[in-house]
Curated annotation (Swiss-Prot):
Keywords of this entry: Coiled coil, Phosphoprotein
Pfam families, A to Z: DUF4594
Stretch list, region Disordered: 1-32, 175-245, 262-545
Start-end of Low complexity biased regions: 225-242
Gene: Ccdc9b
Residues forming coiled coils: 52-99
Modified residues (Phosphoserine): S404
Protein name from the UniProt record: Coiled-coil domain-containing protein 9B
Polar residues bias: start-end ranges: 328-341, 361-374, 457-474
Keyword check for Coiled coil: yes
Length: 545
């Protein structure tokens, strides 16, 4: 068995031989087959691998640091470029502001005029400075207004002999340029001492400007006092800008013109209403052309049609101008509100239509109530005829309410039927006499038939309108319970509906042509009821036609 010393010696010799021949670079401790390799090889390998990894991580960290440095440098360059660009933009903006101001002054530079044209920069304040006097000003005399002072003091401060600063806030919807002009008077050297319009007004109040459009499309802003009204009265309301108030004024004028044109179409050339339902409107009351509309609204009156009425004592032209050529509001009709409810609020054609409907309903109800009774009686007569087939006499179903001339003739013919006075127990009626009084030429008159409960002949006078003929009818009806019926044929005609005329006329013609025979005395109450109806001519209760 080979000892470790021998193995070491052999390994050293082999290593020397390999070193001479350019062999492997393994250390003696790592030579294959050595005891050191067998015993301590894992510990040495771990010791050698640690520095290798440390070097690689160091290299990676260095590379990352270098990359970060390069990025930092690039960002610094970009920031510098951005800063330079921002500075250039700011410088260009300042130069543009200075170059955009065109100061136009007269040749002598009078101190009572100043016109400055400012290029618009939306949402920013621009300070315009200009000396009122020709003499140069010392730095100590000049006064400046910062943003804080603008917030605390008035927006504009004017002082003769001092530096003038006007702070203007432009609106986004404004036009490209605004001309700010201020013309103070020569006596307004001390504007704070004298509160007048123009430059002499008190500048303690905020600067108010009104815009007016000219032919060039530029708005001119001129400061004005609250009490002074400019030529176009915009009627500014609280919280509205000058442009908004101007737009509202234009819109209001257009709406008034449209309303006037619309209402003018509803009138004829004579000035009257062309529509029939406008005729019931109240007549126009004379009003002053310059009467303010707000006063009427405050009184709570409702406005009528805003149009020109007929020319009255103060003649007014079609364009709404009063005498003297002064423009004014058109005459208006003032009406008083009504508290009526329901159908009482209807006026004119609507009220007439409603009344017509009520009349039609009433006539229909009357016709229905009048047609119910005749139909019931006709059914009763038909049933009676069916139950008594043995009877030889014929009882025609008569119409109790004749309305046509034919029906009147039939009833008058029936009433002229007379009984023989000498034979009270005669059971048959005499044939109809159509020749008495000219039945065809009779007019509606008053026919009275008196039937009493007593036995014996009763007198029944019949009077005609001309009074030429009178006939006494003798009735031998001994049946008790008969009543008096009197009616006027004109009233019958009035109560009869129009659809009953044809049927009544046919029934009257049948009565004229059919002979009537009276039933014997021994027949029961049916005959009495039939006689009652046939003589009275009316189906209803006693006294009804």
């Amino acid at each position: 068995m080979i000892s470790c010393a021998e193995q070491r010696s052999r390994s050293r010799q082999g290593e020397a031989d390999r070193a001479g021949s350019g062999g492997s670079s393994f250390p003696p401790a790592l030579a294959p087959g050595s005891c050191f390799e067998i015993l301590s090889a894992p510990g040495i390998s771990m010791h050698l691998a640690g520095p290798h990894k440390a070097e690689s991580t160091m290299r990676r960290h260095e590379e990352k640091d270098a990359e970060l440095d390069r990025r930092i440098v690039a960002l610094r360059k970009k920031n510098q470029a951005l800063l330079r660009r921002y500075q250039e933009i700011e410088e260009d903006r300042r130069q543009a502001e200075q170059g955009g101001m065109a100061v136009t002054t007269p040749g002598l530079l009078q101190p009572d005029s100043l016109t400055v044209t400012i290029s618009q920069v939306p949402g920013e304040k621009r300070v315009v400075s200009r000396n009122w006097a020709r003499a140069p000003l010392s730095p100590g005399v000049t006064t400046t207004l910062t943003d804080d002072e603008d917030a605390a003091d008035a927006p504009g401060t004017f002082s003769m002999g001092h530096r003038v600063e006007l702070a203007v806030t432009m609106e986004n919807k404004a036009k490209a340029k605004r001309i700010v002009s201020e013309k103070p008077t020569t006596q307004a050297r001390s504007p704070r001492a004298k509160g007048t319009s123009g430059g002499g007004r008190s500048w303690r109040a905020p600067l108010q400007m009104t815009s007016s459009s000219d032919s060039a499309g530029k708005g001119v802003l001129e400061p004005r006092s609250p009490g002074v009204v400019s030529s176009p009265p915009p009627q500014q309301s609280l919280g509205l800008s000058p442009e908004a108030s101007w737009d509202y004024t234009q819109w209001k004028q257009e709406r008034e013109q449209i309303d006037l044109a619309r209402l003018a179409r509803h009138r004829n050339p004579q000035g009257d209403w062309s529509r029939p339902w406008d005729l019931d409107k109240a007549k126009s009351m004379p009003q002053n052309c310059h009467k303010p509309r707000d006063r009427d609204l405050a009184m709570g009156s409702r406005k009528g049609p805003r149009t020109h009425q007929k020319p009255q004592h103060p003649p007014s032209s079609l364009d709404g101008k009063c005498r003297g050529g002064q423009s004014g509001r058109p005459s208006m009709t003032s009406t008083i509100g009504s508290n009526a409810q329901g159908k009482e609020r209807l006026t004119g054609r609507a009220r007439r239509y409603d009344m017509k409907e009520d009349e039609m309903l009433q006539s229909q109800e009357g016709s229905q109530s009048s047609t119910k009774t005749p139909s019931a009686e006709e059914e009763f007569v038909q049933k009676r005829n069916e139950r008594e087939p043995d009877r030889q006499e014929t009882v025609p179903a008569t119409s109790p309410i004749p309305a046509s001339p034919e029906g009147l003739k039939g009833e008058s013919g029936t009433s002229t039927a007379s009984l023989a006075p000498d034979s009270p127990q005669h059971s048959d009626l005499a044939p109809l006499d159509l020749s008495v009084g000219g039945a065809s030429s009779r007019k509606p008159g008053k026919s009275t038939c008196i039937l009493g409960p007593k036995a014996g002949a009763q007198q029944s006078p019949v009077s005609w309108p001309n009074g030429s003929e009178q006939q006494t009818l003798g009735c031998t009806d001994h049946q008790p319970g008969l009543e008096v019926h009197s009616c006027t044929e004109s009233q019958r005609k009035a109560q009869t509906p129009e659809p009953m005329e044809d049927r009544a006329g046919k029934a009257g013609a049948q009565e004229n042509l059919t002979p009537r025979s009276r039933p014997p005395r021994g027949i029961g109450p049916r005959a009495r009821g039939t006689s009652k109806r046939s003589r009275a001519g009316g189906p209803g209760p006693a006294g009804r036609c």
